[in-house]
Amino acid sequence: MSVLKTLVINPRSGVKPTATLFFLHGLGDSSAGWSDVAQMLSQRPSLSHVRFVLPNAPIQPVTLNMGMPMPSWFDILALDDLSGAEDEAGLLKSTDEIKKLIKAENDGTAKDLDGHKIPSERIVVGGFSQGGAISLLTGLTNPTPVAGVAALSTWLPLRAKIATLRTPTSKTLKVFQAHGDADPVVKYEYGQRTVDFLKNELALNDKDVEFHTYPRMPHSACPEEIRDLAAFLEKVIPAQ
């Protein structure tokens, strides 16, 4: 069982959900920071069958922010170079916690499911910035294939090891990668390089990896991006 606290938004219709979106917030944020977006998505008729699970990261010191404790999925040592030192232990620990949450959906033991089971192939793992990095790792390494990954303003960590960490079923992973080209925090180039790595180094199918660019968008989200995310969800976890 995962130790993470979650905010859960179930279908308004009261019907049993047939799909789940996990969405992980960024550094220093919480589930509350993305609850409005989740509520908006849940109100779309095409996504009325989806339940939204927003986990909260543990509070821990962050080297990049002078060691200040804050909600963080892993320690960030630097963001100026994708080949720099990484908190591998922290990355893998948070990834394992998300996998536990996925397993609880599979088993029907998660909050509010009451025995109703949601298989991995009906689950999307998404996140913003630091949360998106964990989402990519989770999608590539989960023991059972998930429906997709939604990675917003983020990058793929552990690139030197991911080829050995990934599961064979991740070869068919569907990825929604999105980034603003004016991002001063996580460089737009990092999103581009992540997509190139997924396609060229991990051999994901071109048609399974989407890359969306939002002109003049900084390290944030925008309405157009959320509409594109909704379209991705409608495609990979459609109503049954």
Swiss-Prot record:
<keyword id="KW-0378">Hydrolase</keyword>
<feature type="active site" description="Charge relay system">
    <location>
        <position position="129"/>
    </location>
</feature>
<dbReference type="Pfam" id="PF02230">
    <property type="entry name" value="Abhydrolase_2"/>
</dbReference>
<dbReference type="InterPro" id="IPR029058">
    <property type="entry name" value="AB_hydrolase_fold"/>
</dbReference>
<dbReference type="GO" id="GO:0052689">
    <property type="term" value="F:carboxylic ester hydrolase activity"/>
</dbReference>
<keyword id="KW-0443">Lipid metabolism</keyword>
<feature type="active site" description="Charge relay system">
    <location>
        <position position="183"/>
    </location>
</feature>
<keyword id="KW-0963">Cytoplasm</keyword>
<dbReference type="GO" id="GO:0008474">
    <property type="term" value="F:palmitoyl-(protein) hydrolase activity"/>
</dbReference>
<protein>
    <recommendedName>
        <fullName>Acyl-protein thioesterase 1</fullName>
        <ecNumber>3.1.2.-</ecNumber>
        <ecNumber>3.1.2.22</ecNumber>
    </recommendedName>
</protein>
<keyword id="KW-0276">Fatty acid metabolism</keyword>
<comment type="function">
    <text>Hydrolyzes fatty acids from S-acylated cysteine residues in proteins with a strong preference for palmitoylated G-alpha proteins over other acyl substrates. Mediates the deacylation of G-alpha proteins such as GPA1 in vivo, but has weak or no activity toward palmitoylated Ras proteins. Has weak lysophospholipase activity in vitro; however such activity may not exist in vivo.</text>
</comment>
<comment type="similarity">
    <text>Belongs to the AB hydrolase superfamily. AB hydrolase 2 family.</text>
</comment>
<feature type="active site" description="Charge relay system">
    <location>
        <position position="219"/>
    </location>
</feature>
<keyword id="KW-0539">Nucleus</keyword>
<dbReference type="InterPro" id="IPR003140">
    <property type="entry name" value="PLipase/COase/thioEstase"/>
</dbReference>
<keyword id="KW-0719">Serine esterase</keyword>
<dbReference type="GO" id="GO:0005737">
    <property type="term" value="C:cytoplasm"/>
</dbReference>
<dbReference type="GO" id="GO:0005634">
    <property type="term" value="C:nucleus"/>
</dbReference>
<dbReference type="InterPro" id="IPR050565">
    <property type="entry name" value="LYPA1-2/EST-like"/>
</dbReference>
<dbReference type="GO" id="GO:0006631">
    <property type="term" value="P:fatty acid metabolic process"/>
</dbReference>
